Amino acid sequence: AVTGVQTCALPIFTIERLLQSTGRTIYIFITQSTGAIINIIMDPILIFGWFGAPKMGIAGAAYATVFGQTVGALLGLYFNVKKNREVKLSFKGFKPSWKTIKEIYEIGIPSIIMQSVGSVMVFGLNQILVKFTTTAVAAFGAYFKLQSFIFMPVFGMNNGIVPIIAYNYGAQNRKRLNETMRLAAIYGIVIMTVGMFIFWAIPHVLLGFFAASPELMRIGTVELRIISLVFPFAGYSIMRGGVFQALGKSVYSMYVSIVRQLIVLLPAAYFLSKLGNIDYVWLSFVFAEFFR
């Protein structure tokens, strides 16, 4: 049922790309931020049944995600209709172009695979964590919610550099291309470094948003501090992935993602879990980052 409802929010990705293609990335930031904030607000309400809402447990987290994505999609549709003058949304005279569809999939399939790899990684890691305690799974879920706020501006900048790099690559303007790549890498590293310090300084405050139990607080504090150590490296890697996408070579990012998440991270997490201490499992993220 949750999967069926969530498919209704899928158009948000197409809607956001329409805004990106015309340089209106500020609206993408607004839609994604709004969706993430609503998700975080609705999580405890639906999980624990606050304010008269039904107590849904784990399913509540899924429905909170669906609700946030749906609001983001509707907001993105509004921006396209009211603000995106270059794009007219209409099915009148609509006719598929197989050549265009082929070009889209040549670039899009690696991204599809990378998204799938991420889902497989999360599923596999949850299977490892649940052998310790379900609280560990909850802590991992809390981390993913929190890290979205740190990664969001970097992914937004990544979306912004793609058309700039692609345009200057086509125009053979190497000076501007190199300058864009340099500045993107610097800003990505700086933003993620700030995020690392936040996760190190106030993990208890961040986890408090999830009404964390003492056990979740202990597990989550160590988790946030260890995983955030590689945030600066991730900032650079995300920007590099944007360069590959702009040059039509996103397949390289796909290879890196597969190696990092499936060949390195999951096996490392599995073997580290055999040491009997859940804190060691988070070190797998540090090891895997060297293969990003």
Residue ranges and their predicted role:
Residues 12-28, 139-197, 201-203, 234-256:
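Small-residue-rich hydrophobic transmembrane alpha-helices
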Residues 1-9, 55-109, 165-230, 271-292:
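Short alpha-helical transmembrane segments in multi-pass integral membrane proteins
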Residues 35, 68-72, 76, 80, ...:
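Transmembrane helical elements of multi-pass membrane transporters/channels
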Residues 7-20, 28-36, 61-75, 155-158, ...:
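Short runs within selected transmembrane alpha-helices of multi-pass transporters and secretion channels
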Residues 17, 44, 111, 163, ...:
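Small-residue-mediated transmembrane helix hinge/kink sites in multi-pass secondary transporters
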